[in-house]
Amino acid sequence: MLNSGDIGFMIIAATYVFLMTPGLAFFYGGLAQRKNVLNTMMMSVAFMGLSSVLWVLCGYSLSFSGDLGGVIGNLKWFAFNGVGAEAGPYSDNIPNMGFALFQMMFAIITPSLITGAVAGRMKFKAIFLFVFLWQFVVYYPMAHMVWGGGFLAQIGSIDFAGGNVVHISSGVSGLVLAILIGKRKGIEKRSVVPHNIPFVVLGVSLLWFGWFGFNAGSALAADGLALHAFTTTNTSAACAMLSWMIIDIIKGGKPTVVGACTGGVIGLVAITPGAGFVPIWASFIIGTLVSPICYFALSVLKPKFGYDDALDAFGCHGIGGIWGGIATGLFAQTSINPVAKWDGLVFGDYHLFVAQVLSILVTIAVAVVGTLICVGIVRLFTKLRVDENSENVGLDDSEHGECA
C-alpha cells in the first residue's frame, strides 16, 4: 500500500543524491590543475543531462523490467511507458516512478566518477561518447544483475546502495581507461597539487550530505532500516577521516585537509554496500580500515605499476568498493535486513562471503571488458586524447574556450 510519508522521504532522498554530482564536480575540480578545472567539472555536470535522458528513455527499463539471461532487462518501460503512480514491483509503499527517479540519480553520478581517472588529457567528445556507450554496456547490466533480479541477486550477493554497481564498476573502468589513454605529459617530473582546496572541502561536504540520501534512501522507506543505514554511513565516514588524519601525521607530521577529505569519501564508499546490512559496531571497523587499505593502494601500488589515475578514481572508489563488498560478506546480519540470505563470515556462515567475492570478480570482469569495448567503438569516431599543445595550454581553453 502506498505510503505518503515514504513517498515524501524518497523524493527528498533522490534530491540529496542528485546534489552529489555537483558535489563531485567541486571535489574533482578542486583537485585538478587550474588550467583544467572547468573541463574536470564539466565531465560531471554534462552527465546530469545525458544520463537523465538515457535513463528515462531506456535505462530504467533495461535495468529493472523483465530479465534476459540474468544480465539485462527489456524495453517494456521504454520512455517510462507504464511507469506511473501505482506501487512498483520493487516496493509496495512507493510508486514505480518514485523508485525509477531515485535510481536515476545513481545512474547520473556513476559515470562521473570515472572521469577523475583521465582528468587533464581526454577529449571531451571522446569521454561523452564513452559514457553514452558505457551506460549500456556496463551500468545497466550491472544494475540489473544486482538490483533488478539478475544473476548476482540470484546467487545471493547483496549490495545495499552500490558498492558493485556504482563504485567498483566506475573505479575499475577508470583504471582501464587511464591505462589505455596514457599518462599526463611530464607527470613523472613534477608533482601536481590541488589548485583549490576549499573547493575540495565544499565538494566533500556536498557528497557527505548527499550520501545520507544515497544510503538511507536505499531502504526505500522512512523506517528503522533507513535510520540504521544513516548511522552506519556517518560512522564509517567519520572513522575513515580520522584514520587518514592519523596516517598523515605518522607519515608527514601534519594532518592535511585533502587527506581528511579523502578519508571521508572512502569511508562513505566502503560502507555503501553494507550500510543496511552490517551492525553499527562493524561500521567503525569498515571505516577505520579502509583508509590504510586505500592509502597503500595510492602510495605503493599506483607508483609501482605506473598508471596515472589522475584524481584517484580507482584508488578511492575501486579499492574502497572492493573492501566494502568484502566487509559486507564478513559482517552482514540477516537480523538487520532479511534481504541477506545468510549471516556474514564472522558469524560462522561462509555462503554470503563467497557470494560477495564472486560478485566483486564479476563486476571487475564486466567493467574491464565493457570499457575495452566502449573504447574500441569510440576510437572509430575520434581520438581519445587531446594533442600535446592542448594539454599544455589546458583543457579549459582548448576544449571549452573558457577560463575559470
Put a short name on every predicted segment.
Residues 1-404:
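Glycine- and aromatic-enriched membrane alpha-helices
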